[in-house]
Structure formats: C-alpha cells, structure tokens
Amino acid sequence: MATALGFRCLFRTRPAPLCRHVDRLWRNPRRGHRLSPADDELYQRTRISLLQSEFPQAVYIDSYSSRGFTICGNRVFGPCVLLPQTVVQWNVGSHQDITEESFSLFWMLEPRIEIVVVGTGNKTERLHPQVLQAMRQRGIAVEVQDTPNACATFNFLCHEGRVTGAALIPPPGETALASLGQASE
C-alpha cells in the first residue's frame, strides 16, 4: 500500500527544471487535437449549448386555421414549407399548383429529407403523378393527407427524430352562410 502511494506521489511531482523552456511547457501544457489517455476528460469533450437553449431542435406545428399556421409560437400566413429548423412561405394556391419545381427545395437540402408530408386542405387530394415520380427518383417518400392530419403526422415524425419536411396548404375557412346552410339541413 505504501509503495502504491509512493508511486502515485512520484507521478505528481514536478521534474527539476532543466531550462526555462521545459518549465514553461510544464506550467502551460499544449492541448492539441491528439490528447493522451492520461489527460483529463474535461479537455476531451466538445459542447455547444448556447444554440440549444435558444432554438428548438425541431419545428413543431402548434395550430392551424384558414389563414395559416402557428409554428413554434410564431404565426405564418398562407401555404408554407417546413424543413428541419426552418419555415418558408410556399407560392402555391391549391393542390393543382404543386409541381416538380415547387418541390425542388426538398431534394436540394443536406441532410437529405427522408419523408415529405403534404397537406392539401380540407380533404386529401391527388398530386400529379410526375411530381410523385420525381420525388421517388430522388429517394424522398411523400405522404399526401388533408392538412389537419398532415400537421399531426409531421409533429409525430419530428418527435421520432426523423428528418422530415412538410408542404402545407391551409384548409379554406367556412363562411358564416355555408355553416348556417349546413346547420339548417
């Protein structure tokens, strides 16, 4: 036991300074990218915590209306595209306006989007076959749903940690006359 304690003290003692250069290196060791196993673990870790407290890891849809969406507490008016940590206005009016060009944003991104959830309004509409074919050729799955279900699916996939995108068209609002007409029938 005494010898083990003696060896431990031996390694902690400072060598006699042979010159000022050796003494300076002993007080201020250089920390390079190649650390020896004897170095403290504190110097081997890299942490970035500033951005984690300011920005969420993923974009979540809080609510939707006929005017647009509430995404992470921010209101977005009109159709929009949701990407990991980004929201972009989308220049489409209805599902008929969705073209290969309007989806080109999804295959230009790195890391590659795994699945795109498309919300087409109040009901599920069919997209042009060429658009779906273009997405399949680039290895991106497409899920077409009505907007309320597309919002829920997008949130679920983001919660799972998948690299997900969404292209959402707000459902059209009901006018007071239309809702009164349905109520009287």
From Swiss-Prot:
Query: Per the record's keyword annotation, is Nucleus included, yes or no?
Result: yes
Q: What is its main location?
A: nucleus
Recorded hits in InterPro entries, A to Z, give: MTH938-like_sf, NDUF3, NDUFAF3/AAMDC
Q: Superkingdom of this entry's organism?
A: Eukaryota
- State if Cytoplasm is listed as a keyword: no
GO terms in the biological process aspect are:
mitochondrial respiratory chain complex I assembly
Tissues expressing the protein: Strongly expressed in testis and weakly expressed in the epididymis. Expressed in spermatocytes.
Tell where it localizes: Nucleus; Mitochondrion inner membrane
User: Which keywords does UniProt give here?
Assistant: Membrane, Mitochondrion, Mitochondrion inner membrane, Nucleus
Q: Can you cite an annotated GO cellular component?
A: mitochondrial inner membrane
Q: Report the sequence similarity comment from the record.
A: Belongs to the NDUFAF3 family.
**Oligomeric and partner information:** Interacts with NDUFAF4, NDUFS2 and NDUFS3.
Tell me, in a sentence or two, what this protein's role is: Essential factor for the assembly of mitochondrial NADH:ubiquinone oxidoreductase complex (complex I).
Protein name (Swiss-Prot/TrEMBL): NADH dehydrogenase [ubiquinone] 1 alpha subcomplex assembly factor 3
